[in-house]
Amino acid sequence: MFTKNHRRMSSTSSDDDPFDVAEKYYGEERKKKLNRVRTFSAFESTKYGAGPISPLRPTYEPPPVIKETSEPLSSSSSTSSPPTLTPQTSQVQFNLGVGKTKNGSAIHSDSEEEEEDEDPVSNTKKGEADEKDPFDTTDSKLENENSTPSSITGKEIIPHPTGFRGSSEESAIRRKPSIIPIYHDNISQESVIRNANTPTTYNREKFHLRRGSLDESTFIRPKKYYINDVQGTLRELLANEDTDNNCQITIEDTGPKVLRLGTANSLGINQSSIRGTYRLSNLLQELTIASRFGRHQIVLDEARLSENPVDRMKRLISTSFWNNLTRIITKENIVDMAKDTKIKESWIDDQGKLHENQESHRIYVPYNRKDQYEFFQLIKKQRSDIQLDVQYLPQKIDADYIKSINKKPGLLSIATRPDPQAPDSGSLISWPYVVPGGRFNELYGWDSYMETLGLLTDVKIDPSGNPRNLRHLELARGMAENFIYEIHHYGKILNANRSYYLGRSQPPFLTDMALRIFNKTIEVTPELMDEAIDFLKRATLAAIKEYETIWCAHPRLDDKTGLSCYHPEGKGIPPETEPTHFNALLKPYLAKYNDIDQLDFIEKYNSGEIKEPELDEYFLHDRAVRESGHDTSYRLEGKCAYLATVDLNSLLYKYENDIAFILQSFFNDNLQDPYDDNNSNKIHSSKIWLERSHQRKLNVDKYLWNEQDGIYYDYNVKLQQQTNYESATTFWPLYAKLASSNQAAKLIDQSLHKFEEHGGLVAGTLKSRGEVGLTRPSRQWDYPFGWAPQQILAWIGLVNYGYDGIARRLAYRWLFMMTKSFVDYNGVIVEKYNVTKGAVPHRVDAEYGNQGLDFKGVATEGFGWVNASYVFGLTFLNLYAQRALGSLTPPEIFLRNMHPEQRKQYK
């Protein structure tokens, strides 16, 4: 028996979040719900109180709140699963042709026939101006990252006067949808909020239906599609739209750019069109993900296909990409983690069997970490199915030892803690970390700092007062803990935790990284103050050790200038490079030794049998370039170990001031060092660090600053002259607060224009790079390429000196370029971009190519510091700028058409 509190509605409606993470959206629970789908349900209690349902009664239900939770690689994955086991794609059979269609499957059409539920367009008359100045953002507040729009939740929105789409209204609100992507704007200012109990008065002139908003939800329930054959729809979609057969749908594909799908309310009988590259590529991504979760049938929210690209990028980075880039060493994945794919060797297993030219599985443990050695040996004993070689490192690690194990590569152990579930078992738990890209398993140096900036952006206190995204805080903390471990056991923060990187560091960021993690910890979990102080103490002591024993010691410190250089330890040819990487370099030496085989030459050169001083110097600089993190660039090639670079000395200046600040603010300017190698119980105070920073500034001003050009140059300590190479690292003194206010002003006035391009800051200028060609190929850290860390450090530096508007402008340029590529090219996020191009900035013609391009159907990781640059960069933009970004407004148009008062915010 039906009561007056019931109303008839579609059974496919639910309170499920249309933007939920893939595991929940396509997981087992959704599969169970799909089994109950039918054309119509019985009746369901109305949410609008007692009384009969009138045709004028509002029928709108506000969209569910967007939740930010963690998304694993697959429904069965966990932190203990092997990181290399990404979601399998074997279920997706791409490009197999078009199968027969059934009810609910895709029907591909570009016809103009009537559709069930088409997109509304504006009722505003052509040429009629809105009452509100579109450039006036005085009512707009900076949107918090990953916050959900309160304007569409918890309250009722004024419905259409008729409560439904009647025939009398059809001519005004129905037309064929545009091929241009229509993005749902989840934070529309046009949303009208009222109290449900307040009498309603309607003003038709106030109601505007606009592309790119959820206004249509005022009249109808958000649309859902019923796809009863995921694989068949995938094949149909790819066969018709993927004309270049790369399993992606982009603006370069020449298909009809329209696909008809069955609606969920009709169980697939009625059809509705999906149009445009962006929505179709999103459909491809969603179908690919559903297939990897083993789904054969799904109900798909239209909102997931039409999601504002800024919101979609931010959501995927926060809930999916970080998870897929997370690694943690466990019992289950230790073999996959230890495997070295760059170097193959011959080895004998425990049964005496010889394995030739195969990948080995080895892990090295510090000489004084017996607990880790026994733990890994226990894993080896418990798992007879694995071949794991566990080795101790010697106490003294030098260039000769590093060279001696070049043919026995292995993973270097990192920080662990006792398993709280079995404290007496000897079982250990590793700290998690984020890798740069999907193909990596190692912890990298300055990548981790940039990733930390992005991770911490998501860690907040929600409106209810509870911390959210604490997992991201744990990841940031884990990377810092691993750095502390590396400094104490390997002497430095490593390029990466592989044996052939033992002599090589990367740009130092530990002090700022530790301070940001400390501040975020006490912000969201103030009850952990004591633990946070202990963490800050250990990080500071580690940074002091790194500073004194690595960066300000031989061979990296130049005594004459008092400045530091990238100058790693090592001998021979780097073993991790591709076998053919040095072909051109070695060719004349092979001829010199009677056309000796290249592998034989490398063997004899590395052993010292062949001595070539010129090659020794070349590989010294080659290792130094890799330590700088800028591998490779003509700025550094052939001279890096002799350069006192502006980037390194800016970071060391920041170390000096950060350490002084920490000692003064948290440790009463008196911190005892229990790690002092001389066992002298050394006491650290701020005085010496302030003196060091003062002296470094004097040295930088003398040797690196060029008053005439208004720029910082590197200084060649061997030639005793500036290099005059114009590099974006000239902005790093702003990040470190090393420049005076006059130097900063001159740098902005005379040099910024040399680096500002369509997509942000270029790594170096065309003038400095020079001509490139077959004999002088492009280098990836030179013009015309731009990198996320260069943007991030410049933004921070500009704000440090009050140039907020310029930082905002540069951030908009970089984020627009990323968003445009994401929309036009199937959700791509890559390692680096050509910032001078507006059309295809993600295509990079330089060594190593561009990571992040090679995916089938859906990108699942992006690239670590590029992901970070996006979510971090959004914090520099107000709501108006973020909306312009979502509508793909190019920087030139965005800045040119801006209200004069607003334009001041970008200067």
Curated annotation (Swiss-Prot):
Compositionally biased intervals (Basic and acidic residues): 125-144
Family label: Belongs to the glycosyl hydrolase 37 family.
Activity regulation info: Inhibited by validamycin A.
Record region (Disordered): 1-20, 39-172
Effect of K687N: In strain: 3153A
Binding-site positions, substrate: R439, W446, D447, N495, R504, S505, Q506, E576, R626, G629
Swiss-Prot/TrEMBL cofactor(s): Ca(2+)
Protein name as it appears in the record: Cytosolic neutral trehalase
Protein localization: Cytoplasm
PROSITE patterns assigned: TREHALASE_1 (PS00927), TREHALASE_2 (PS00928)
Gene Ontology BP annotations: trehalose catabolic process
Pathway entry: Carbohydrate degradation
